[in-house]
């Protein structure tokens, strides 16, 4: 029997978010709907989830001592990693001492870098993947590129949102790609993965939910990425029955191996009826933002239910839906948005502004969600709304 206490009392059920971006913000909101006390943690102040949490902390989550000290201070019932850049070896130790890591410390540890999860999928589970090799220095990197062949994709083994990711088209790109990968890694310089191209027809995210009643799948989500970062997603993406069955089989094998309860974003390449494993995130996925309108229960609501041990009787898709990221480019900590009336004049359009405190370079600051009679119309509707939003980047005020 699930028991939830009253927030801010000695019987509170406490959840700690490690990572407090826009995805963590939605998880925090869903947990609070069930009366869970939410503690938001990140490496910077005023992160999106901090703005809706009961309280917040700023620490270096890659520092195992800081991480342990905070967790032992707060004693949360649930530790919920929302990003990769965490001292996951310490999470393994904390789990062994009795803390509950969602979905599991093993899942967080294996997926914090691309090497752990790729070796699990390809070498232990025998799943089809793109050709790959790992490199820890420039010499081994050059050998890996030669072995895989060009064109190939280079990624830091630990990064997100496409940071440090590039494509090598010729020998002249090798040194540039290595430098870029070293600059883009979440934990600084380190290993990279070199991946051969899969000649795929499309790629999808299959949101896979492990919960008290078993394993459930959301409808496939199609998406467009630019520079390795999500820009547009839509649901349901059409797949043949054979390909869908293969995708679900791969997703179930990977998530069973990772263990625990919660939502997993399983990324797959599809060519005809053949399906190749790409990556998995043991948490809500950015392409899954579309589920805020496309399903009766969003990926965030599903994650909350699963980790709390609550039932998920039915995941219902509500029609052709799309999301388009609101990408802002510039340098400012005084960002404003206007012309929202134009963006929201259609009855089937919704907007989420994430409340991120600043932008330096390019940053996803919001998302538009739309539904229509078909996917093309939903994507056009969402894009039109994004295009109508005016972003104002005010000059930073110098502190005396």
UniProtKB/Swiss-Prot annotation:
<feature type="binding site">
    <location>
        <begin position="22"/>
        <end position="23"/>
    </location>
    <ligand>
        <name>N(1)-(5-phospho-beta-D-ribosyl)glycinamide</name>
    </ligand>
</feature>
<dbReference type="GO" id="GO:0005829">
    <property type="term" value="C:cytosol"/>
</dbReference>
<dbReference type="InterPro" id="IPR003135">
    <property type="entry name" value="ATP-grasp_carboxylate-amine"/>
</dbReference>
<feature type="binding site">
    <location>
        <position position="267"/>
    </location>
    <ligand>
        <name>Mg(2+)</name>
    </ligand>
</feature>
<keyword id="KW-0067">ATP-binding</keyword>
<keyword id="KW-0436">Ligase</keyword>
<dbReference type="GO" id="GO:0043815">
    <property type="term" value="F:phosphoribosylglycinamide formyltransferase 2 activity"/>
</dbReference>
<keyword id="KW-0658">Purine biosynthesis</keyword>
<keyword id="KW-0479">Metal-binding</keyword>
<feature type="binding site">
    <location>
        <position position="82"/>
    </location>
    <ligand>
        <name>N(1)-(5-phospho-beta-D-ribosyl)glycinamide</name>
    </ligand>
</feature>
<feature type="binding site">
    <location>
        <position position="114"/>
    </location>
    <ligand>
        <name>ATP</name>
    </ligand>
</feature>
<dbReference type="InterPro" id="IPR005862">
    <property type="entry name" value="PurT"/>
</dbReference>
<feature type="binding site">
    <location>
        <position position="203"/>
    </location>
    <ligand>
        <name>ATP</name>
    </ligand>
</feature>
<dbReference type="InterPro" id="IPR048740">
    <property type="entry name" value="PurT_C"/>
</dbReference>
<feature type="domain" description="ATP-grasp">
    <location>
        <begin position="119"/>
        <end position="308"/>
    </location>
</feature>
<feature type="binding site">
    <location>
        <begin position="195"/>
        <end position="198"/>
    </location>
    <ligand>
        <name>ATP</name>
    </ligand>
</feature>
<dbReference type="GO" id="GO:0005524">
    <property type="term" value="F:ATP binding"/>
</dbReference>
<keyword id="KW-0460">Magnesium</keyword>
<dbReference type="Pfam" id="PF22660">
    <property type="entry name" value="RS_preATP-grasp-like"/>
</dbReference>
<dbReference type="Pfam" id="PF21244">
    <property type="entry name" value="PurT_C"/>
</dbReference>
<comment type="similarity">
    <text>Belongs to the PurK/PurT family.</text>
</comment>
<protein>
    <recommendedName>
        <fullName>Formate-dependent phosphoribosylglycinamide formyltransferase</fullName>
        <ecNumber>6.3.1.21</ecNumber>
    </recommendedName>
</protein>
<dbReference type="GO" id="GO:0004644">
    <property type="term" value="F:phosphoribosylglycinamide formyltransferase activity"/>
</dbReference>
<feature type="binding site">
    <location>
        <begin position="363"/>
        <end position="364"/>
    </location>
    <ligand>
        <name>N(1)-(5-phospho-beta-D-ribosyl)glycinamide</name>
    </ligand>
</feature>
<comment type="pathway">
    <text>Purine metabolism; IMP biosynthesis via de novo pathway; N(2)-formyl-N(1)-(5-phospho-D-ribosyl)glycinamide from N(1)-(5-phospho-D-ribosyl)glycinamide (formate route): step 1/1.</text>
</comment>
<keyword id="KW-0547">Nucleotide-binding</keyword>
<feature type="binding site">
    <location>
        <position position="356"/>
    </location>
    <ligand>
        <name>N(1)-(5-phospho-beta-D-ribosyl)glycinamide</name>
    </ligand>
</feature>
<dbReference type="GO" id="GO:0000287">
    <property type="term" value="F:magnesium ion binding"/>
</dbReference>
<dbReference type="InterPro" id="IPR016185">
    <property type="entry name" value="PreATP-grasp_dom_sf"/>
</dbReference>
<comment type="subunit">
    <text>Homodimer.</text>
</comment>
<feature type="binding site">
    <location>
        <begin position="160"/>
        <end position="165"/>
    </location>
    <ligand>
        <name>ATP</name>
    </ligand>
</feature>
<dbReference type="InterPro" id="IPR011054">
    <property type="entry name" value="Rudment_hybrid_motif"/>
</dbReference>
<feature type="binding site">
    <location>
        <position position="155"/>
    </location>
    <ligand>
        <name>ATP</name>
    </ligand>
</feature>
<dbReference type="InterPro" id="IPR011761">
    <property type="entry name" value="ATP-grasp"/>
</dbReference>
<dbReference type="Pfam" id="PF02222">
    <property type="entry name" value="ATP-grasp"/>
</dbReference>
<dbReference type="InterPro" id="IPR013815">
    <property type="entry name" value="ATP_grasp_subdomain_1"/>
</dbReference>
<dbReference type="InterPro" id="IPR054350">
    <property type="entry name" value="PurT/PurK_preATP-grasp"/>
</dbReference>
<feature type="binding site">
    <location>
        <position position="279"/>
    </location>
    <ligand>
        <name>Mg(2+)</name>
    </ligand>
</feature>
<feature type="binding site">
    <location>
        <position position="286"/>
    </location>
    <ligand>
        <name>N(1)-(5-phospho-beta-D-ribosyl)glycinamide</name>
    </ligand>
</feature>
<dbReference type="GO" id="GO:0006189">
    <property type="term" value="P:'de novo' IMP biosynthetic process"/>
</dbReference>
<comment type="function">
    <text>Involved in the de novo purine biosynthesis. Catalyzes the transfer of formate to 5-phospho-ribosyl-glycinamide (GAR), producing 5-phospho-ribosyl-N-formylglycinamide (FGAR). Formate is provided by PurU via hydrolysis of 10-formyl-tetrahydrofolate.</text>
</comment>
